Amino acid sequence: MSVNPSNNTTTSTETNTETRPILHLRNKKTDKTAKPRVRWTNDVVDNENMDKKKSKICCIFHPQREFGESSSESSDESSDESDHSDDGAGEGASNGASNGGSGNDACCGNHKRKQKKPRKSTPNAYEKQPTYKNK
């Protein structure tokens, strides 16, 4: 602090030694914006050898079990999930048998190809006879 005798004013200098904490803002994920993602484990095989681990398969294969054999998955499923898998089971069984599969997989049924209607046979541009107007 210093005093100037001619003006009778006082000047003081304060130094702020406090450090303010840094605030990091993050977007809060909500249920609407959070999309379910597939998490691949290290034992997933990359069949195409292109360093891609993704699947376009929508059907789940359920192998046959011996009588009396239980699975840990069946006890963990809710009634909604088991109802959903039963919806496609009848359709998947018929599709699986016709496609060479064992018929044990539950399928969504979206793999059926639409049969095209046979097109009417029409001549192409080279086969058509030109029409002449009478003069």
From Swiss-Prot:
A GO molecular function for this record? protein phosphatase 1 binding
* Compositionally biased region (Basic residues): 110-120
InterPro entries from the xrefs?
A: PPI_Ypi1
In this chain, composition skew of type Low complexity spans: 1-19
List the keywords (alphabetical). Answer: Nucleus
Q: What is its main location?
A: nucleus
Biased composition, Gly residues: where in the chain? 90-103
Q: What is this protein's function?
A: Regulator of type 1 phosphatases which maintains protein phosphatase activity under strict control.
Family, as annotated: Belongs to the YPI1 family.
Q: Which Pfam families match?
A: PPI_Ypi1
Q: Which GO terms describe its cellular component?
A: nucleus; protein phosphatase type 1 complex
Q: What is this protein called?
A: Type 1 phosphatases regulator YPI1
Q: Which residues form the signal peptide?
A: none
What is the organism field in this record? Debaryomyces hansenii (strain ATCC 36239 / CBS 767 / BCRC 21394 / JCM 1990 / NBRC 0083 / IGC 2968)
Q: Where in the cell is it found?
A: Nucleus
Name the residues that span the membrane.
none
Residue span of region Disordered: 1-135
Q: Return one Gene Ontology term, BP aspect.
A: glycogen metabolic process
